Swiss-Prot record:
One of its GO terms (molecular function) is adenylylsulfate-ammonia adenylyltransferase activity. Residues 2-109 form the HIT domain. This is Bis(5'-adenosyl)-triphosphatase. It is found in: Cytoplasm; Nucleus; Mitochondrion. It holds the Pfam family HIT. Its main location: cytoplasm. PROSITE patterns: HIT_1 (PS00892), HIT_2 (PS51084). Phosphorylation at Tyr-114 by SRC is required for induction of apoptosis. It catalyses: P(1),P(3)-bis(5'-adenosyl) triphosphate + H2O = AMP + ADP + 2 H(+); adenosine 5'-phosphosulfate + H2O = sulfate + AMP + 2 H(+); adenosine 5'-phosphosulfate + NH4(+) = adenosine 5'-phosphoramidate + sulfate + 2 H(+); adenosine 5'-phosphoramidate + H2O = AMP + NH4(+). The keyword DNA repair does not apply. Keywords: Apoptosis, Cytoplasm, Hydrolase, Magnesium, Manganese, Mitochondrion, Nucleotide-binding, Nucleus, Phosphoprotein, Transcription, Transcription regulation, Transferase. The gene is Fhit.
Length: 150
């Protein structure tokens, strides 16, 4: 079973958490180590179009995932980011939250991370030549999946 993420089909091997309404996956081109995404299962383009139960689940999952990636990647803080609409920088037409574990000094200026996120999915940089291997992504997902097993 594949997961739909906007125009992309996501293989289960890169998904490390699934709930009734949301899923979390590793990023093919992370801005920092541990940069992952949390998405609603239903392919909804804009945040305003999510149902209340989807909003609740999305943010509960985001909170859980943030705690795990901060610990796993030895972060000391987390940046959560959502671009909602094209003028906000959204390139995949599916609501998603970027979860990025942070460390002191990971960027010269703390807010540089937003510049990197802005460049993250630009067409000229979003090609397979810039992506991690499926094997590397699956290994990371497997390592994160362990934290969510009951």
């Amino acid at each position: 079973m594949s997961f739909r993420f906007g125009q992309h089909l996501i293989k289960p091997s890169v998904v490390f958490l699934k709930t009734e309404l949301s899923f979390a996956l590793v990023n093919r081109k992370p801005v920092v180590p541990g940069h992952v995404l949390v998405c609603p299962l239903r392919p909804v383009e804009r945040f305003r179009d999510l149902h209340p139960d989807e909003v609740a689940d999305l943010f509960q999952v985001t909170q859980r995932v943030g705690t795990v990636v901060e610990k796993h990647f030895q972060g000391t803080s987390i940046t959560f980011s959502m671009q909602d609409g094209p003028e906000a920088g959204q390139t995949v037409k599916h609501v998603h939250v970027h979860v990025l574990p942070r460390k002191a000094g990971d960027f010269p200026r703390n807010d540089n991370i937003y510049d990197e996120l802005q460049k993250h999915d630009r067409e000229e940089e979003d090609s397979p030549a810039f992506w991690r291997s499926e094997k590397e992504m699956a290994a990371e997902a497997e390592a994160l999946r362990v934290y969510f097993q009951a």
